[in-house]
Amino acid sequence: EMLVFREHAQHHVHAKDNPDDWANIPGWAIASWNDRGPGVSELSAIELERGKSGDRLWDSAQTGLFRHGTMHNNVRMTWGKAFAGWREDAEEAMHLALEMNDRFALDGRDPSSIAGVQWCFGLFDRAFGPVDPIMGKVRKRPTHVHVNRIDMTAYEELTNKATMGVSMDIGVVGGGLSGMFAARLLSDLGHNVTVWDKGSRIGGRLTGWKTDDGTE
């Protein structure tokens, strides 16, 4: 995998004007995705980004991704395929998976990373039967099966660690837009954050101005 798949991905990306385009997915897979019926349970992008899908394995993998920038390749195969169950449009699901990977992963936008996510939607693969309601003919990797192959308690301990390995107590002075953004980011990364602000309302002075009649 280190030799063959890496070189395969490098050549694939080199040969494409738009390596992350949906048109790179093989025709049989696109046809299979188009034949899917309704029934997926859509979650918002922010819920998925913050690891709030409700799926124990997926949420742990996503938390590790945005806190540490890493995800084991075998887990990423399962992580990437799960997006298909949260979007009616498989193309949208693939681009959302690529966006998350590109934004948070240390190897985001790397050829192996791009091809790895697209593999989840049929790239470099063949059709499988029987047809699945969610994945169609594309290879399945359900999280409820994968979770039985690993020590989930140990995996969660690894991925839930705060960035830099230790949770710090951090104070942010100023509850304006920048202060709240910094506090939210540090909290997402596993640190204990306290915000101090002299204002009477959350959000600092930029959140609104009161007029004489009390409206904002």
PLM region descriptions:
Residues L3-Q10, F66-A115:
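Structured ligand/cofactor/substrate-binding pocket environments in proteins
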Residues T163-M168:
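A short, basic/flexible loop-to-alpha-helix module at the beginning of a structural domain
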Residues W22-P38, L43-L48, A93-E157:
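C-terminal, helix-dominated tail/subdomain
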Residues G174-S178:
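Glycine-rich Rossmann-fold phosphate-binding loop(s) that bind the pyrophosphate
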Residues E1-M71, G136:
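Gly/Thr-rich phosphate-binding loop signature of adenosyl cofactor/nucleotide-binding cores
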Residues G171-V173, S187-D212:
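Glycine-rich FAD pyrophosphate-binding loop
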Residues E1, K16, N73, K81-A82, ...:
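Catalytic cores of glycan-processing enzymes that make or break glycosidic bonds
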